[in-house]
Amino acid sequence: MSRKKKPLPLLENITITDVAAEGKSLVRVGDMVVFVPFCVPGDVVDLQIKKKKHSYCEAEVVRFIEYSKVRATPFCEHFGVCGGCKWQNLPYEEQLKAKQKQVYDQLRRIGKVELPEISPIMGSEKTREYRNKLEFGCCNKRWLTREQVASGFKYDNMNGIGFHITGAFDKILPIEKCWLMDDMHNRIRNSIRDYAFEHSLTFFDLREQHGLLRDIIIRNSNSGEWMVIVQFHYDEEGDEQRALALMQHIADSFPEITALMYVNNQKCNDTIGDQDVIVFKGNDHIYEHMEELRFKVGPKSFYQTNTEQAYHLYCVARDFAQLTGNETVYDLYTGTGTIANFVARKASKVVGIEYVPEAIEDAKVNSEINGIDNTSFFAGDMKDILTDEFIAEHGHPDVIITDPPRAGMHPDVVKVIMNAAPKRIVYVSCNPATQARDLQLLDPLYKVEKVQPVDMFPHTPHVENVVLLRIKEFKN
């Protein structure tokens, strides 16, 4: 006979004390740390423990007794259900303080290296409509909120277009209005939804892998161009004609779209990197502008999703590099070569390395359209490409700029960097925790000289951080 699980406790009259990772808040109760979503420091609440581990618990609020004086009123109707903007209830100034503290704590606690004074975080001038790309799932199982379930209302149509819910991969939270991007994207998405409802188009079933309408990607640029990519899943005869009719509706309704494309994706996931993207109308790209440069952005291209803050981020990286025009610069994890091309005119030579071959082709095109002839780009796994032999062939780096994924740099990459011993390393990171780990590995040879956090994503717990490392001078 199985033992009955002991009920998890209810904690009453608890005052939230601090902000934690992943957009949660925390409070210490005895020797236990309790993490709570959708609270801010100063809230007084009753908490129901949902998950108990050895040294921490996860809980949710069952009653607000008193709201914090620093609490902000969320501006989005989907806040608290959608997992996107978890900090809308925290004033932006408090968000910046929390991100500054996060960078300091992680560099100090994980890196354990000597740090200079960390520069004040660069906040985003725009805290709404700051993104240039959003992706929406189309699904035949809409997520119902607790209030909707409690109402007992029966929905005849369970189809929805919106965001996936954490912990429920096969369900979609229907989105009426998202504040992350220019409002035209809401009009485009809702128009597609309304057309699909009116014409009884089937929505994708993630478990059964069938249904016509699957996914929508919307991008815009600071040049005023718009790109829309609709993913379909052809199941039966007539689906292609139905898909093309929807595409014509989009083209007729939104002449502002300069790159309208579609995909017939028969895979189990929604990634399009290995799919044929078909142009329905207009171009297969849009352009972003940065200073005097133009960057071509295709349907598969990576480009920083906050254009204005990306410019400030790249300016910091370029300033930290302290280029005079004589340096050989290596740009590791170069993506589509944005940083490489951005610094090229202040360098003698720039070598870019990136894992994704399509991104490298974009990087080469971006050099070509900007008349930049001192860059070279190479595709492959960083730990396999960046070797002592590669450096011997392509020139010793005076400066290395590295912008790795969230996992940070592979230890083999760090070793090659240490062997090359460039004078300066500019480390751009979207994850200060793994950046701190790598700084510790570099510490025997490098000193952290400058630290500049940059907020790319207001109302989220994510923060970018740029660190300048200078090679240490050893006295004999």
Task: Specify the residue positions occupied by each region the protein language model found.
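Terminal RNA-binding accessory module
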Residues: 1-78, 376, 384
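Rossmann-like S-adenosyl-L-methionine
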Residues: 2-13, 18-23, 237-476
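Short, conserved phosphate/pyrophosphate- and ester-handling motifs at nucleotide-, phospho-/glycolipid
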Residues: 42, 181, 306
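Short, acidic/hydrophobic/Gly-rich beta-strand patch recurrent on exposed beta strands
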Residues: 25-30, 162-165, 229-231, 363
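Short, aliphatic-rich beta-strand segments
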Residues: 218, 224-233, 294-298
